């Protein structure tokens, strides 16, 4: 589980004229708090864990720019994106993996079994986003890249192991990264960041 705090967003906001922030996976509000320190017009954060949403509502009660959504990420995307100004570029931080598990409410195995495709919703999130808006000027940061491909990830170097690949196969929840690169090959550049469990930073190609 990484955090948006890993990144200084200033250059991306300026270069790509980013006006809104949308994250999947509120967690304890750490990444949202970081995003809120920048001058976004609006910020959206979605989590299926009602307790985490309620906690963040209290934490950010004074910030009227922040919108907290208790829902599955794909459903929230489908609900909110059509209401947003299509001319305002968005920074997406996609981190809605394994509901309940990162905060020790349930195990990762239980999360995979209980939530199924909603435990690893990235492909459906991206497909839904791209069906609802022209993303050619939007920026995406995808967390937990190590779930989707091999690499020299900091988490692995420090002895971390993802133990549930066989369970993913059993549940037909296999993850790979080809779909990401295929989706963005015409419009964006993809840069890998191997800190923590890995990030994929997806920025518009020049001339978009």
Predicted regions and their residues:
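A short alpha-helical cap/connector motif
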Residues: 1-91, 97-208
């Amino acid at each position: 589980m990484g955090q948006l705090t890993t990144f200084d967003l200033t250059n991306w906001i300026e270069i790509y004229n980013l006006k809104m922030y949308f994250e999947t996976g509120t967690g304890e509000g750490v990444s949202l708090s970081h995003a809120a320190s920048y001058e976004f017009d609006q910020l959206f954060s979605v989590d299926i864990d009602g307790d985490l949403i309620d906690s963040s509502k209290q934490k950010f009660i004074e910030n009227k720019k922040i919108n907290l959504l208790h829902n599955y990420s794909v459903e929230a995307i489908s609900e909110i994106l059509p209401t947003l100004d299509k001319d305002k570029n968005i920074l997406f931080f996609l981190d809605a993996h394994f509901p309940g598990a990162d905060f020790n409410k349930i195990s990762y195995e239980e999360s995979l079994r209980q939530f199924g495709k909603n435990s690893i919703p990235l492909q459906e999130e991206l497909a839904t986003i791209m069906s609802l808006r022209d993303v050619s000027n939007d920026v995406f940061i995808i967390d937990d890249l190590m779930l989707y491909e091999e690499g020299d990830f900091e988490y692995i170097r420090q002895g971390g192991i993802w133990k549930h690949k066989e369970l993913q196969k059993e549940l037909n929840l296999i993850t790979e990264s080809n779909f990401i690169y295929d989706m963005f090959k015409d419009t964006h550049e993809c840069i890998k960041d191997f800190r923590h469990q890995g990030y994929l930073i997806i920025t518009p190609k020049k001339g978009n």
